[in-house]
From Swiss-Prot:
UniProt KW Transferase keyword: yes
Taxonomic source organism: Aspergillus ustus
Signal peptide coordinates: none
The protein's name in its UniProt record: O-acyltransferase pboC
EC number: 2.3.1.-
Residues at the active site: H149, D386
Subunit-structure text: Monomer.
């Protein structure tokens, strides 16, 4: 099993309909009876060897009420969701760029005191890895999903959800074959040597790693950090990309950049402007990408961690001096160059060798690096999760909302990004029914105040320019 990730992933989804928990429980139980999907109910067990404590899976011969394949808890309220002190504050899309709320405020809707929060909490108990908390109101439903990050990454979670939904809709023939008990990534260390990694010169030595850790310690010493959701209208992202493409066209160079490239470049420059790091430092921008289509395409479905970062390393002064198209294109080039099969092999060789020798992965960047990490979960289709077969009653009338029956109107990740050990972490949770981008970031509280001022200014400028709402 993947023994690197100790984080617990916690996702919370709000539905503006009444969703029956029993239908979800039955369909999930059925999924765990199909082929290798029964692995999802495995227990984590420690296994000691010369390299220290590692972990492995033990799969019960049969799942029973006393030894289930997953935990599915329920809470039911006779009132509407608007009367609940926590669930009533779950964010909704606003008309313009907006900061929607602190995700930690909603953690109580998922894991409860005493529930596992780290891999070791699972390893020394007999608990299954999948936890669900289903809260039903008379007009809405909140579902919290929790699992150790070693079980699934964002894209793997999307594969799991699509398989579950296929069973819920009675389409078991659409459930993909899940990989067996061998690690599909094991061959990735057999290709190019670590020295072929394009950023090999940016691998930090132990002294540089200590300096890097000191920078991180200093940055977090006097200021608390907070995760919040920033919702970005579809039209704003389209305008950003159009402006970037115009700038690139005028330069007579490469012209393709994706929405993700542009969104990441805009956020990185904005965060640099409000955080104010020394301009002679380096920006280390880590854009996580899915390796399945390149390195695991011949394998059955693989849900464990299969993402690595495409790193862009640039002087901060240059990032802020050049137009946004410069950083967007650098992000695109880094992704194209580093997602090749030889680079994936070299990266895995580097990291696995380090883990085997020291128990820790190597740090890539600069000793004074201002590090940001970003992951785009849009292809996990969290906002397109169709639970309509389990919807027993419509909550909010369809004419008053943009979502279809049984689709989520809010998606949050309550996992604190501080676990990632970087200065600023973020992810794209996906696009809602109107095409608006839901992103989530970890910043200092003072920086959130500055970002709110910037977004208000942008909204005012766009409203003035268009002569209508943003």
């Amino acid at each position: 099993m993947d023994c690197v990730c100790d984080e617990t992933m916690e996702l919370i989804l709000r539905f503006d309909d009444v969703i029956e928990p029993e239908k979800l429980r039955q369909s999930l139980g059925r999924l765990l009876e199909i082929g290798n999907w029964r692995k999802l109910g495995a227990r984590v067990r420690p296994r000691e060897n010369n390299a220290g404590v590692k972990f492995e899976y033990h799969i019960p011969e049969k799942y029973t009420e006393t030894r289930p394949g997953f935990i599915y808890r329920e809470s039911k309220y006779s009132d509407g969701i608007s009367n609940h002190p926590t669930a009533s504050r779950l964010p909704r899309q606003h008309s313009g760029l907006s900061i929607l709320g602190a995700t930690q405020d909603f953690a109580s809707l998922g894991l409860q005191p005493g529930d596992p929060r780290h891999l070791a909490d699972w390893a020394y108990t007999d608990l299954p890895q999948l936890f669900f908390h289903h809260t039903t109101f008379k007009d809405a439903t909140v579902i919290a999903m929790t699992y150790p990050h070693s079980l699934m990454d964002g894209m793997g979670h999307g594969t799991f959800l699509r398989a579950w939904i296929a069973v819920l809709h009675g389409r078991e023939d659409e459930v993909p074959e899940l990989g067996g008990f061998e690690d599909a990534r094991s061959h990735l260390t057999e290709g190019a040597p670590a020295t072929k990694y394009l950023l090999h010169q940016y691998i930090l030595g132990w002294y540089q790693t200590i300096v890097f850790g000191c920078w991180r310690f200093i940055e977090t010493l006097w200021s608390s950090e907070e995760d919040r959701v920033v919702c970005i209208p579809r039209q704003f992202v389209q305008e950003l990309r159009a402006n970037v493409l115009d700038e690139l066209d005028s330069g007579k160079g490469e012209t393709f950049v994706s929405n993700n490239d542009v969104l990441l470049a805009w956020f990185a420059r904005t965060i640099l402007s409000i955080a104010g790091p020394l301009r002679n430092r380096s920006l280390v921008l880590m854009n996580s990408f899915n390796i399945r289509s390149v390195a695991l395409s011949s394998q059955p479905a693989f849900i464990n961690n299969a993402v690595i970062p495409a790193c862009t390393i640039l002087p901060i002064w240059k990032v802020l001096r050049e137009p946004m198209s410069f950083l967007a294109m650098q992000v695109r080039r880094s992704l194209v160059q580093q997602r090749g099969l030889d680079q994936i092999h070299a990266w895995y060789k580097l990291m696995v060798s380090s883990l085997e020798q020291t128990g820790r992965p190597r740090v890539i960047g600069t000793s004074d690096g201002f590090t940001m990490i970003f992951s785009n979960w849009d292809k996990a289709s969290l906002f397109r999760l169709d639970l309509s077969p389990a919807a027993s009653e419509m909550g909010l009338p369809l004419g008053q909302r943009s979502t279809q029956l049984g689709y989520p109107s809010c998606v949050l990740c309550t996992t604190p990004f501080s676990m990632l050990g970087v200065r600023s972490g973020g992810c794209c949770l996906g696009k809602d029914a109107e095409g608006n981008w839901w992103t989530q970031w970890r910043l200092r509280r003072t920086e959130w105040d500055r970002l709110e001022t910037i977004l208000e200014t942008i909204n005012h400028q766009r409203q003035t320019h268009t002569g209508k709402g943003v």
